[in-house]
Amino acid sequence: MSSIFTKIVNREIPAYIVAEDENYLAFLDINPLAKAHTLVIPKKEVSYIFDLDDESLAGLWIFAKKIAKAIDKYMQGEAIRTGVAVVGLEVPHAHIHLVPIKNITDIDFAKPKMKFSSEELQNIAEGIKKFVEL
């Protein structure tokens, strides 16, 4: 059975896509810890990030770096930098969380999630896209 992320890759369900290339996809988390919280995934469904082959794992991190730099530019003045987390429990599809942060407590997955309207999420995704350099 396909993960929810594979369904996003296949455009079976909608997402607020920030960037993609032939192997990787970045889209906004719909239950974000912060404004511009973005998920970066390989298009190939692999449950555990460290089960990716070396080339795919390296490519995922290089792609994530480009997205993080775009988030940094988009969030300038609202966050100090983009934090990174790999948890791997909530969806059985390898993914990296990119979370704009001001301090370490901003990346606490136990805290309540933020809520944004569809229009706000679309505007955030479009704002980040302007800074993506693939």
Regions found by a protein language model. Give the residues of each.
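HIT superfamily nucleotide-processing domains
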Residues: 1-134
